[in-house]
């Protein structure tokens, strides 16, 4: 079907409409189809699973996700931000659970009270597909698994996993949004000079559920991301619209493998998550834990993302990451924003658009992959340490005093559109400043102690104090 919309770029020049094949009808694929459809391109979207809107259960994917500023911007550009925020549940900070069941609140942003939103994956995907279906120039095809592709020619072969029927098609542009195990990326990897790395971590995850109370309400304060940090492993819980909680246990596979029976499981939870037993329910805990196997976590980095002006990969296909920064979906949605802005700038020059996207985006994608890996250590271990809490308070104070200069790392990642690579550079700059300040203050303190020790004849105190300060600097 011919597109019904006239496309122009930001320079006011009319750009030709493209026939685009979007491979993958998940969150990123359906959103990018909307971005392209809105610009007037003809879009054929192919998804190898059945239509999620009619599926009773989506296997192997997290039920809910954290939506933050980058994702919100991409949704706003297709007019869906407000509707999804109304469905989402705002989370204004972390609520930490200790071994005794005591809870401590750590706000995300104590100064401006910004928050992230817990949104249902299935609902979000349904909204995106419903919106895409309203465009006459967007066509949705389900149960279409990519078998092979000639990316240089824009040719693809799909097969229906159920009927085994084959479909052959051709497009001006192929966009791979088909996840961490992308079939489109597999075609790109075959090309010489391609950089690719795949890293599995030794930790897996398993999902549980906290039901509503007998009164039908949330079992815990629902405007927080709840975390049970335990050093080498952790458990988290995000609220759902139906008053349930999606609980995810992250820990090494060796720990999972050591739990072989009901008794092992209950002993483990009584030791590390005692308050969660009553929240989940003993019978439900046992049933949910043993009904599925823990899933693996993978990080994928690669470049370039494009094949000339004929194909590009975005989302998890380009940069799959572990889920500990809540940026997987947001980074994928930001890919849509970045590409759309390049289409606005360069019109029909697809070679230039894809080359510029690939050249500039990979560094940011690699940066957020690394940050996500680091944040696992923070969430399961560092959040309980005084040094972490002190640094967070100091960051909040400096952010309050210098809001345009000193932006904490989490704020820059979750509440701004600053490039991910710049977020890391900012953090390194802040660390350097604080190290120098600590050093200068410590030297001044030692000098003052020396002066007063000499004046009052107490050099033992000076030596003890100086030794303590130098040890602090060494730890820093």
Swiss-Prot record:
Q: Name one GO biological process term.
A: anthranilate metabolic process
UniProt note: pH dependence: Optimum pH is between 7.0 and 7.5.
Q: Which residues cross the membrane?
A: 397-420, 433-455
GO CC entries? mitochondrial outer membrane
- Annotated pathway: Cofactor biosynthesis; NAD(+) biosynthesis; quinolinate from L-kynurenine: step 1/3
Q: How is its activity regulated?
A: Inhibited by pyridoxal phosphate and chloride ions.
Cofactor(s) of this protein = FAD
Membrane-related topology note: Multi-pass membrane protein
Q: How does activity depend on temperature?
A: Optimum temperature is 40 degrees Celsius.
Localization annotation: Mitochondrion; Membrane
Q: Does the keyword Mitochondrion apply?
A: yes
- The reply on keyword Transmembrane helix is yes
Write out the similarity annotation. Belongs to the aromatic-ring hydroxylase family. KMO subfamily.
Q: Report the protein name in the record.
A: Kynurenine 3-monooxygenase
User: Which organism does this sequence originate in?
Assistant: Aedes aegypti
Its gene?
kh
């Amino acid at each position: 079907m011919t597109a019904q919309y006239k496309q122009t770029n930001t320079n006011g020049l009319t750009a030709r409409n493209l026939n685009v094949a979007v491979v993958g009808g998940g969150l990123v694929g359906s959103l990018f189809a909307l971005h392209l459809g809105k610009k007037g391109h003809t879009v054929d979207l192919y998804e190898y699973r059945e239509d999620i809107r009619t599926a009773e259960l989506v296997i192997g994917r997290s039920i809910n996700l954290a939506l933050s500023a980058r994702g919100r911007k991409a949704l706003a550009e297709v007019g869906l931000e407000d509707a999804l925020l109304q469905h989402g549940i705002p989370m204004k900070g972390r609520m930490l659970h200790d071994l005794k069941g005591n809870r401590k609140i750590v706000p995300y942003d104590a100064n401006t009270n910004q928050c992230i939103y817990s949104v249902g994956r299935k609902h979000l995907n349904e909204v995106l597909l419903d919106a895409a279906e309203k465009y006459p120039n967007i066509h949705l095809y389900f149960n279409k698994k990519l078998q092979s592709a000639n990316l240089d020619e824009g040719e693809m072969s799909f097969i229906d996993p159920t009927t085994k029927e084959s479909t052959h098609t051709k497009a001006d542009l192929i966009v791979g949004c088909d996840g961490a195990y992308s079939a489109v990326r597999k075609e790109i990897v075959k090309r010489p000079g391609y950089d690719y790395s795949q890293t599995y971590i030794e930790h897996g995850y398993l999902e549980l559920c906290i039901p509503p109370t007998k009164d039908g309400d949330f079992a815990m304060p629902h405007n927080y991301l709840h975390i049970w940090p335990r050093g080498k492993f952790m458990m988290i819980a995000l609220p759902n619209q139906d008053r349930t909680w999606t609980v995810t246990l992250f820990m090494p596979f060796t720990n999972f493998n050591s739990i072989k029976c009901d008794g092992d499981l209950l002993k483990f939870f009584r030791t590390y998550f005692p308050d969660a037993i009553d929240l989940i329910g003993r019978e439900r805990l046992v049933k949910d834990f043993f009904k599925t196997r823990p899933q693996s976590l993978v990080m994928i980095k690669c470049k370039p993302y494009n094949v000339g002006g004929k194909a590009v990969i975005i989302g998890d296909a380009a940069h799959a990451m572990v889920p500990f920064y809540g940026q997987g979906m947001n980074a994928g949605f930001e890919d849509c924003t970045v590409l759309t802005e390049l289409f606005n700038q360069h019109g029909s020059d697809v070679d230039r658009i894809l080359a510029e996207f690939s050249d500039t985006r990979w560094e940011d994608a690699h940066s957020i992959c690394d940050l996500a890996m680091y944040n696992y250590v923070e969430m399961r271990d560092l959040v309980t340490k005084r040094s972490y809490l002190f640094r967070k308070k100091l960051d909040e104070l400096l952010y309050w005093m210098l809001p345009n200069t000193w932006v904490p790392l989490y704020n820059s990642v979750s509440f701004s559109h600053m490039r991910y690579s710049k977020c890391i550079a900012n953090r390194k700059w802040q660390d350097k400043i604080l190290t120098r300040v600590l050093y200068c203050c410590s030297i001044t303190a030692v000098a003052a102690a020396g002066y007063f020790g000499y004046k009052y004849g107490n050099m033992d105190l000076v030596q003890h104090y100086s030794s303590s300060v130098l040890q602090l600097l060494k730890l820093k």
